[in-house]
Amino acid sequence: SLVGSEMCIRDSLNAVDLILFVVPTKAIRNVAKQVNDYLSRSGERPVLVHASKGIEIGSHLRISQMLEEEINPNYYRGLATLSGPSHAEEVSREMLTMVTAASQSLSLAQEVQGIFMNQYLRVYTNTDLLGVELGGALKNVIAIASGIIEGLGYGDNSRAALITRGLAEISRLGIDMGADPLTFSGLSGLGDLIVTATSSHSRNYQAGVYLGQGFCLEDVQIKINMAIEGLSTCQAAYELSLKRQVEMPITKALYQLLYQEAEVETLVKLLMQREGKSEARVDHFI
C-alpha cells in the first residue's frame, strides 16, 4: 500500500549513514522536501551527498544551498558533493575514474572519500565546496558551446581554444565569488570540462552538436530526451555574470543563441572580433 511504502521509505532513510542525491537540478528542491518529510531527529544523523551539477535560475543557488534551504539542519550531519570526470556509462562498467569529494568540513570530505573509494574509483578531497560546485555546473555550458563548434564543422584548434577560454571564464566567475583558483585546474574543473566538452557520452556536448548542425532547441531536446543541464545553467550563469559584472563572452553568446534567437555564425564572428586582450595575469585569468 501507499502508506506501507511511505513507512518503508521513512524507515530506510532513518537507518542510513549517507543519502546520495543524483537528480537533475530542477528536481532537487522537490526531492529534498520529500526527504525532509521522511527524516527525523532520532538516531544517527546521515551525511547528505549530491552528485548533481547545476545552478538554480533566479536564485542562483548551488545544489548544496538548495539542500540547506529545504532540509532541516537538525536532520543531517553535513553536506558534501562528488564531482569530476565521471560518465555513468564508464563508472557502471568499473572503468578507472577519479573524482573529488568536497565539503566545507575536511573530516566530512574524508569520510565520503572513504565510503566511495575502491579499486576503480579514486576519490580526492577538497574543502572548496563553492569552487567544486561551480566548476561542475558551468562546464556544461562550455560543453554545449564545444558541441556547437563540432556541429559547425570547425577543427580541433577551434575546440581547444573554446575549452581553454571557457575555463578562463569559469575561473573568473568562481574567483569573483570567492572560490580557490586552484580548484578549477583540478578534477571538478578542468577534468570535468575536458570529458564533458569532448565526449559523445555527454548530453550537453551532443546537444551542442545538434545546435551547430542547425536543429532548433525544441528538436534538440526531443533528440536527447534526457536532462540537458547546461541549458538552464547557461541562463543562471548569464544572470550571475550580469549581477556580478564578470565578463563571460562564451556564456553570453550561448545565452543569445538559446534564448534571444541570435544566429550562431554571427555569434562566432563577434567572439573572434572582440578587442585584443592579454591572455592572463599571475593572479587569475582575464
Predicted feature locations:
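Active-site His/Glu-centered metal-binding helix of metallohydrolases
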Residues: 8, 142, 190, 194
